[in-house]
From Swiss-Prot:
GO terms for molecular function: ATP binding; tRNA binding; tRNA-uridine 2-sulfurtransferase activity. Belongs to the MnmA/TRMU family. Its main location: cytoplasm. It catalyses: S-sulfanyl-L-cysteinyl-[protein] + uridine(34) in tRNA + AH2 + ATP = 2-thiouridine(34) in tRNA + L-cysteinyl-[protein] + A + AMP + diphosphate + H(+). The gene is mnmA. This is tRNA-specific 2-thiouridylase MnmA. Gene3D superfamilies: Adenine nucleotide alpha hydrolases-like domains, HUPs, Translation factors. Keywords: ATP-binding, Cytoplasm, Disulfide bond, Nucleotide-binding, RNA-binding, Transferase, tRNA processing, tRNA-binding. It comes from Methylobacterium sp. (strain 4-46). ATP binds at residues 18-25, 44, 136. One of its GO terms (cellular component) is cytoplasm. GO terms for biological process: tRNA wobble position uridine thiolation.
Length: 382
């Protein structure tokens, strides 16, 4: 077996590397090239890069395509750019907008990985005769004794991206490889300098790639100009406190920017797209104890429906560590739920819920799903 767990010599193993133009994927290409693999770099053009050509900290736009091409030239590997704009708009951007209109808080990076990178790009890689598709994600995969591969949290907990990759299927894991899963970020940058890559000190991606300066409302207003529907801001106790210009300007857990002068700290507790109401309340009203998930992807060894009561750990935001919970199978709805050991604040429909075998730093990823509904830890008055 070679270093990618494939039964071929490196020089006989073709690996397509998804090159975003950042330091991580460029180092992956460099590592594999140094190990003697037949490396091909592919960069996806995902959106109209006119406004982003000179913007740093995004991915898959004009400057990033240039950086990826330059890295490939430095490493001496072939490089191709594929136009996936239409696919990306339909699968990711349009869905992102619709989710916000329906009062949800979507995680577009999960859908991009699921629908674009690990489905469409992977199919293209296989068409090119690739034995593996490698990415610069900080997550680990390992061969299982009985066959197949399992997904695990990365060595560097500060860089772990397993939350965004829970939707990776077993079939995709068989082909995907994540060489940075066992490296700390400072080692990645050291390798970039060793390889002579111009992106060695390029800043990491911060915002959602198609949302300039984090202003998602502008994206939604451009795509769905009729989406802004004025409505009331209502307290949990039934009081009407004010009005707003559209629920797309609010997210669950938000405190600032409510435009209320009540003398008490209030948070967005719920968004109701049917009535266009923004429901607010005290911080304790944000506590969630039960999460129902949909679009579930399960990577565990046993069927999910047979694991009612199984102790796990769950992550509802990328910036939070996994927290202890228990699986619950809702037989009436034929869907999974997780019961949190300690209530979480600010959990919103549309977010991702990643499930782990435990809350350890190298825990196995068991799958996850999109949060469909949450149950408050206390009874609400409205």
């Amino acid at each position: 077996m070679n270093s990618l767990d494939l039964p071929k010599a490196p020089q006989d193993t073709r690996v397509v590397v998804a090159m975003s133009g950042g330091v991580d994927s460029s180092v992956v290409a460099g590592l594999l090239r140094r190990q003697g693999y037949d490396v091909v770099g592919i960069t996806l053009q995902l959106y109209d890069h006119g406004a982003a050509t000179h913007r740093r900290g995004a991915c898959c736009a004009g400057q990033d395509i240039h950086d990826a091409r330059r890295a490939a030239e430095t490493l001496g590997i072939p490089h191709y750019v594929l136009d996936y704009e239409d696919r990306f708009r339909e699968a990711v951007i349009d869905r992102f907008a619709e989710s916000y209109i329906h009062g949800e808080t979507p995680i577009p990076c999960v859908e991009c990985n699921r629908s674009i990178k690990f489905r469409d790009l992977l199919a293209t890689a296989l068409d090119l005769g690739a034995d593996a598709l490698a990415t610069g994600h900080y997550v680990a995969s390992r061969a299982r004794p009985g066959g197949g591969r399992a997904l695990y949290r990365a060595l560097d907990p500060a860089r772990d991206q397993s939350y965004f990759l829970y939707a990776t299927t077993p079939e995709q894991l068989d082909v995907l490889r994540f060489p940075l899963g066992e490296l700390p970020k400072d080692e990645t940058r050291r390798l970039a300098r060793e390889f002579g890559l111009a992106v060695a000190d390029k800043p990491d991606s911060q915002d959602i790639c198609f949302v300039p300066q984090g202003r998602y409302q502008d994206v939604i207003a451009r795509l769905r100009p009729d989406a802004a529907r004025p409505g009331e801001i209502v307290h949990l106790d039934g009081r009407t406190l004010g009005r707003h210009e559209g629920i797309i300007g609010f997210t669950v857990g938000q405190r600032r920017g409510l435009g209320l002068a009540t003398g008490e700290p209030l948070y967005v507790v719920r968004l109701d797209p049917e009535t266009a109401r923004v429901v607010v309340g005290p911080r304790e009203a944000l506590a969630t104890s039960v999460i129902r998930i949909a679009e579930t992807n399960w990577l565990g060894d046993e069927p999910l429906a047979d694991l009612d009561g199984m102790p796990v750990a769950v992550r509802v935001r990328s910036t939070r560590e996994p927290r202890p919970a228990a699986l619950r199978w809702n037989r009436a709805l034929a869907c999974a739920e997780v019961v949190l050991e300690t209530p979480e604040d600010g959990v919103s429909p549309g977010q991702a819920c990643a499930i782990y075998a435990d809350d350890g730093p190298r825990a196995r990823v068991l799958g996850g799903g999109t949060i469909q509904k949450v149950e408050a830890a206390r009874r609400e008055a409205a």
